[in-house]
Amino acid sequence: MTARHAGRQQNAWILMVGLAALVVTLVATQAQAPPKAGADFRVKAYETHLAMTRASPYKDQSWSFLGPTNVAGRIADVAVADYPAFRRLYAGSCCGGLWQSDDLGETWKPVFEHEASSAIGDVTVAPSNPDIVWVGTGETNIYRSSYAGAGVYKSTDGAKTWTHMGLADTQTIGRIVVHPTDPNVVYVAASGHEWTENEMRGVFKTTDGGKSWKKVLYENPQTGAVDLVMDPRDSNTLYAAMWQRERRKWADPRTESGFTHSGVWKSTDAGNTWKRLEGGLPPGNDLGRIGLDIAQSNPNVVYAFVDNYARGDKAPENTRNPYGVLIDYYPVGNEIYRSNDKGATWTKMSGQDDQQKLFMRNLSSSYGWVFGNTRVDPRDENTIYVLALGVSVSHDAGKTFEGMGRRGAPPPTPTPTVPAVAGQTTTAGASQAGPGVNRPVATTSPGGDNHAMWLDPKDPNFMLSGNDSGFRVSKDGGATWTRAAIPSSTFFDMAFDMDTPFRVYGSVQDHGSYRAVVDVSNGVAAMKPVAFESAPGGEGSTHAIDPTNPNIVYSAGTYGAITRSDLGAAAAAGRGRGGSTTNIRPKPETGDADELRGQWLAPMILSPHDPNTLYFGLQYLYRSKDRGQTWERLTPDISGGDKAQLGEVPYQTVISISESPMKKGLVYVGTDNGHLQVSIDEGKEWTDLTMKLPERKWIAKVLASKYQEGTVYMAQQGRYDDDFAVYLYKSTDYGKTWKSIAGNLPAGPMNMIQEDPVNPNVLYTCNDFGVYVSTNGGQKWEVLGGNLPSVNVMDFVIHPRDHVLVAATHGRGVWVFDVSKFQTK
């Protein structure tokens, strides 16, 4: 090598290092920047959304609820209001608002469906007045699909009407405690922002019914309150569980090195002062989420359900955790601690032998931050329940546990009932929806992934449970359970086939994938809710169906899995799952520096020019021209591949793909960390558009226009930065320059953008409030319809033949809207 060439190479190397440092600095600066639109903005934006709904020219056109009537969604909390003549039950949906039942869970109606957030963290009834109900919005249970709230709400008329009572920027609420005799005294445990640091976390108190609040317990911007309990005999004594955490896009929330503020605090003067309790509890740097409860029969006894991150037993060689990451040691996992002296000292009760130690370690697998609640039997201080992947009970103060739902008589035959739901009502036993419609289902299990439990202080046989499969009631001490028919399913995606009538496909959190027939032959208004049937795919999947053969179903997702199913005879027999399913995931290539990684909802599309051609996104873009039999890798790692942002949760991956319907091989690819690339020659060469983007945000949707070759749309999200501004753009020069088409949209995050399949002037988009339509290319937006609940619309499709928009909500199932009026040029 000559000196001249060496000098050039050295200069090039210096330039590369400098540019890399600049990019890292820019990304870090952007990641630390405060959100452009926080939760306070969101509350005001929702008021704008309501005003837009009232003024919408389409307010009198209704959505029809399609279902599913047989799949419920995640319940974050349960509560009971006892009236002289009856008992009222409440179920707080993670994402579908608050539901109410006056017949012990037989029928339900929504009572919190038009507020600034449909994400429920906690629901509490004032002990002194059953008409006073408090709701804390924003779920403390951190999921792939947990959403920020908008503060606390109060009802004084049994949940008929609601008033926003502040604390909007807390974003997640773990617990609300109301004074036993003075309903104006209320405490709120706020866990704070999910993704970023903030000071609106800790324990808050009001003495005037929520008109004003005082922060009475606060540690730092990373530490929030996740649980709060009050001594049943001394209302001045409270215990708070504090959790110091950070959540990153590439890692779930765990206690970081140097985090020492997680623990249990106690106040004996109604929250004015607090003292940390340490005698016997694990040190703060090992503590994760903590759940608390007090024995009502003996308030000296306090239990702490602890997620302990300390190193436990050595793992066998090549052991992987549930994320597929190699580990050397198991974490200690869940533990039960008991205090017999009101928190002065603590004794570890669980894991007394190897069998029980293993039981506790597996109780929450490796994600204890999702669970973390314990309940003490109101009559027996030694009987406790812990809520995790399952529900487990101990009758010896936590020394030994057994799983519930493994004993008891055969389940009784359920009585057919109908939920009282506006826009979602069917007749009892209605045949049009198939078996199991709107009926409670008997089971011997309390459900999986458990978050809430209520134990009747007067009747040891009556129990309520809230979990990922919905709301359940037991009237025999937990031997058998009845799953309530609350239509609150949490969909991630939506796809359609071209059969007649057509079907829609979607995946549901913690349930799997489902499909249903959409029969609009008598009009959308005449549609009835239906039960959905199982379909190919998992709980986090995207779908695509061959437009020439509705039996060929592709499903991708769950961190990069992808399959092709030929339903064949199974579909003809009315069974959505069956036939043959083939794993068609691309294989790693020799020399790959990293393992293949895909998002929770790894994107996959069929080419609009050839149904045998698929595009699939991991950290690379792949294309198959033979229905997934073979693949070619079209790009290098287009996400940037920053090693510092590679963790147990796949990140820096492709999240959206679009091929132009006008030009074969004109392909756009967007990533979760804000990279965008385009190819105009079928993937031979790529142009990086990243530095031309207005924002470096999660690219929820990139859409190549079907009307103008150079036009492309993009919806970006700030959700994972706790940012609720609108990022919606249009380019008319293949992505070189961008113009905002946010117009009068009230707030984000925007989940989707679509063109009308007939009218080039019409666009549709959606966010956490609903669906919007523009008839002038995005200059002005209107709320679509007047009766859709205020809920996160994750995805929607527009059927090109049947002129309907089908929306997949995360909390209220699937809804259908007639868009034929927009389809005249």
Listing of model-derived features with the role each one plays in the protein:
Residues 4-5, 19, 543:
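Absolute N-terminal positional cue centered near the fourth residue
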Residues 32-825:
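Beta-propeller blade termini and top-face loops
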